[in-house]
């Protein structure tokens, strides 16, 4: 957590290397110098200016709170030799940059979750059995593991789909992998919280027996406001205790930011068009 500011944070959706759109949105918002800036993960990849985007967020210093997204972690995995570049990736310019080591270290030290003012920010989502305290405990375990000297081995062990549901009896890599996948990959789960990793359409395209993670009955984080990105097909969505921010900028749609006032009715959305930031089809 950062020092509390009197100014409500402004939360941005997935930038994914769309630097021009981010600059336009930032200039439109013209936030005061003491306004915290939250980023819901996926700062880089698929957009045309991943390096410039990452450098700009790093330059914000402690004012920027950015949680790790799946594309940010893909950058770490490629840098560590765990994964290879895929068609459509635009992170090569980061890896080739003279300040690559510093940038990778900055990304590696980002959190998986951030909690402040009764709001919990993650990249993708949460499992229904987790309350905010457990989510933060698991995020801390992941963060400490990725900041340790053997972080490459840890990161390698986190990739995989099993187990796909939470149990308090999970240990070691299995426990971390479930948390990793929920924080950075989830869209749909069963009412019991078993995750599904293939479907990426909107809620109406949920596979049989699955529903959006945030609609799981009895979700224990319903008592806090959850702020997240990741799900472009869902788009911008505001509920009293839910702020979904990924409005598909990298696919040529819009980049969104929301001023996270304590009163949900007072939250203001600002958007810019992203015609110049269209990624190739997956």
Curated annotation (Swiss-Prot):
Its EC number is 3.6.1.41. The keyword Transmembrane helix does not apply. The keyword Transferase does not apply. Pfam families: Metallophos. CDD domains: MPP_ApaH. Belongs to the Ap4A hydrolase family. This is Bis(5'-nucleosyl)-tetraphosphatase, symmetrical. It comes from Burkholderia pseudomallei (strain 668). The gene is apaH.
């Amino acid at each position: 957590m950062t020092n509390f500011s009197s100014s409500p944070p402004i939360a941005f959706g997935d930038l994914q290397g769309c630097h021009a759109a981010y600059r336009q949105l930032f200039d439109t918002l013209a936030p005061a110098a003491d306004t915290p800036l939250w980023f819901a993960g996926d700062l880089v990849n698929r957009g045309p200016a991943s390096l410039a985007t990452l450098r700009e967020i790093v330059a914000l210093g402690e004012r920027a709170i950015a949680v790790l997204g799946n594309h940010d972690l893909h950058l770490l995995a490629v840098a560590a030799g765990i994964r290879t570049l895929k068609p459509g990736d635009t992170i090569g310019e980061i890896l080739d940059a003279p300040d690559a080591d510093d940038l990778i270290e900055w990304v590696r030290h980002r959190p998986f979750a951030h909690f402040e003012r009764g709001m919990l920010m993650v990249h993708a989502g949460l499992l229904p059995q987790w309350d905010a305290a457990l989510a933060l405990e698991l995020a801390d375990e992941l963060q400490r593991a990725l900041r340790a000297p053997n972080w490459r081995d840890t990161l390698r062990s986190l990739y995989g789909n099993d187990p796909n549901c939470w149990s308090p009896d999970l240990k070691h890599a299995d426990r971390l992998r479930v948390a990793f996948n929920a924080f950075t990959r989830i869209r749909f789960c069963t009412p019991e919280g078993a995750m599904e990793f293939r479907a990426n359409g909107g809620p109406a395209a949920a596979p049989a027996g699955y529903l959006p993670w945030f609609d799981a009955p009895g979700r224990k984080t319903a008592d806090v406001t959850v702020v997240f990105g990741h799900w472009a097909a869902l788009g911008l969505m505001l509920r009293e205790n839910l702020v979904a921010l990924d409005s598909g900028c990298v696919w040529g749609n819009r980049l969104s930011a929301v001023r996270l006032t304590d009163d949900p009715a007072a939250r203001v959305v600002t958007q810019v068009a992203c015609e110049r930031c269209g990624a190739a089809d997956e």
